[in-house]
Amino acid sequence: MAAADDAQFPPPKVLTYPASTPPTLITQGAEGRLYKTTHLTRDRPCALKYRPPKPYRHPVLDARLTKARLSSEAKVLERCWREGVPVPAVYAMDPAAGWMMMEWIEGIPVRVGINEWLGDRPEEGAEIPQVADETPIVDLMKRIGAAIGALHKTGVVHGDLTTSNMMLRPRGFNPVDGAPGDEGKAGSVEGDVVLIDFGLATQSMSDEDRAVDLYVLERAFASTHPRAERLFATLLESYKSTFKKASSVLIKLEDVRMRGRKRSMLG
């Protein structure tokens, strides 16, 4: 199947040059592919996001949409990176060719880290018992809340906040030489939280948009980590302490929750 896909949608030309490190396909979705390769030198890993042409769309329209979406994502990432939000740095891009090269984030998804941490705890009930404030999982929730607070403070909403779109990068990791950090074993909830996959991100100062961002994460968290659902309140507290306009966002969040419950009741 992969070979057939490669024949139909070959990698972008930038990955076929003789000096390029052979790329590794990491993920493939309806809208694009993510490859792991290198940037400038063979010991500097990077991620290359590629949006191949869509045969079902008119070529001119497809080219315009691809260019607009990649350019928008790059602008959002650059804005976040300048403001100190933990996101991948953009190294290079060619919107006309449909690709963007970014910093490779070493580590594991937050989703994996939380589930591994929960897997080490006995399942005595539907939820984990109350945990102490200083436990690693609580500290992780605080770091996630702070990262989202920094994102919203910058005037950006992610659009698809889930624990799969967050990485735990080992502290002390050097992206230039690939030197390992202090952590990184699977299942650890230690490390720096890095937000990834900004394909649906927009620039917005709206409390409503920010509240929807949080609601999407809250629903995804409850679905993916039901035993740790009560810890989401810790995330919101950290968000509030990081972002001074959070109070009005959290009020809007209550409205969004109410609308969500009504939709659930109506089917």
Swiss-Prot record:
Does this entry carry the keyword Transcription regulation? Answer: yes
Q: Where is the Protein kinase domain?
A: 20-267
Which Pfam families does the UniProt record give? Pkinase
Keyword Metal-binding: yes or no?
no
Q: Which InterPro entries match?
A: Bud32 (IPR022495), Kinase-like_dom_sf (IPR011009), Prot_kinase_dom (IPR000719), Tyr_kinase_AS (IPR008266)
As for subcellular location, the record says:
Cytoplasm; Nucleus; Chromosome, Telomere
What chemistry does it catalyse, as a reaction equation?
A: L-seryl-[protein] + ATP = O-phospho-L-seryl-[protein] + ADP + H(+); L-threonyl-[protein] + ATP = O-phospho-L-threonyl-[protein] + ADP + H(+)
Q: Show the active-site residues.
A: D160
**Residues reported in the UniProt entry to bind ATP:** I26, T27, Q28, G29, A30, E31, G32, R33, L34, K49
Q: Name one GO molecular function term.
A: protein serine kinase activity
What does the annotation say about its assembly with partners? Component of the EKC/KEOPS complex composed of at least BUD32, CGI121, GON7, KAE1 and PCC1; the whole complex dimerizes.
User: Could you tell me what this protein does?
Assistant: Component of the EKC/KEOPS complex that is required for the formation of a threonylcarbamoyl group on adenosine at position 37 (t(6)A37) in tRNAs that read codons beginning with adenine. The complex is probably involved in the transfer of the threonylcarbamoyl moiety of threonylcarbamoyl-AMP (TC-AMP) to the N6 group of A37. BUD32 has ATPase activity in the context of the EKC/KEOPS complex and likely plays a supporting role to the catalytic subunit KAE1. The EKC/KEOPS complex also promotes both telomere uncapping and telomere elongation.
Free-text comment on this protein's domains from its UniProt entry:
This protein is considered an atypical serine/threonine kinase, because it lacks the conventional structural elements necessary for the substrate recognition as well as a lysine residue that in all other serine/threonine kinases participates in the catalytic event. BUD32 has protein kinase activity in vitro, but in the context of the EKC/KEOPS complex, the catalytic subunit KAE1 switches the activity of BUD32 from kinase into ATPase.
Protein name per the record: EKC/KEOPS complex subunit BUD32
**Organism whose genome encodes this protein:** Chaetomium globosum (strain ATCC 6205 / CBS 148.51 / DSM 1962 / NBRC 6347 / NRRL 1970)
Origin organism lineage: Eukaryota, Fungi, Dikarya, Ascomycota, Pezizomycotina
